[in-house]
Amino acid sequence: MRRNFFASALLFALSASFCFAQSGSVAILEDFKPSILNQPGQEYPQVNSQRYARFRIIAPAADSVRVSLGLGGRGGTKLAKAADGSWMGTTAGPMDEGFHYYNVNIDGGKFNDPGTLSFYGSIRWESGIEIPAHDQDFYALKDVPHGHVQQV
């Protein structure tokens, strides 16, 4: 009897955890800030505190725009066209911390994002975006007191 009770309780706990895991998607916080690798004066691409990236490309005559980040074969991030001719989109999920190469696919052609710096990697120049690490402050340069060095 006691064994059946514990088995039932365990089964209930496991099934409840699966239900919570499948409940709706997480709301994306709108605290986006320009990436540290942007060209001077450029607002996009942007990164938020949840590690999502948002891209904006101005291509009024384009039929389709996609940002290719190499996200496990998911086809990248498809951008939606706005009334002003710009294209904007946010990654489907949070990105890993660190540096990521990417390119912009406009009507089948691969281009670098003019809003960010370009980096040489993967045998070509590509755009780059930095997703800040949660422990980046530990490695940042800080104004700390220094001792006096002398020879005795």
Residue ranges of predicted features:
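Bacterial N-terminal signal peptides
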Residues: A7-S17
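A generic structural signal for short, non-catalytic loop/turn and secondary-structure boundary residues
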Residues: L11, P60, V144-G147
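Polar low-complexity intrinsically disordered regions enriched in Ser/Thr and small residues
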Residues: A16-C19, G73, M88, Y101, ...
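The feature marks proteins involved in alpha-glucan
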Residues: A21-V47, G93-V152
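Positively charged n-region of N-terminal signal peptides that target proteins for export
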Residues: M1-F5
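Structural beta-strand segments of beta-rich domains
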Residues: R51-F55
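Aromatic-rich carbohydrate-binding modules that target alpha-glucans
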Residues: Q46, R56-E97, G109-S122
